[in-house]
Amino acid sequence: MEPADKVLMIDHEKCTGCRLCELVCAVKHDGISNPMRSRIRVVKWEQEGLYIPMSCQQCQDAPCMNGCPVNAISHNETLNRIEVDYDICIGCRTCVSVCPFGAMNFNTIDRKVIKCDLCDGDPQCVRFCDIKAVDYVDAGDVSIMKKKEAARRLSVANKKAAALQATM
């Protein structure tokens, strides 16, 4: 399967908040284990025990691309991903403010935006996530997987409701 046919799929219910995905991403791209240099970010709500890895969704009609005043962001048709041309990027952060997923990050050292590039088809966050909270799957399977998960959740909810009703 070509990289263009695959996407990152994130299951926040599996994420434990270990942040290993952030570390391996930063090491892969910048050679340092600094989570602030990562292209994937784990948003944490510690009191609720909720951790959500956030990464570029590689939107077809990307707000970051449409909002860039210097056209530094484009859609690579071959790899089916959104890319930043760092030679053109002026670091204005417009893309950061318009991304509906909060997936565009700003590198304060280089004064440029950074975002997931899918590691050229071999995402390291997936490789190192032992619990598979982050996976790299066939794009066509995402909708099917989400429907199966919704059906599973509905089944669990029905069983809980039936058990609750039986106790009344």
Region annotations inferred by a language model:
Residues 21, 68, 99:
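The canonical Cys-X-X-Cys-His
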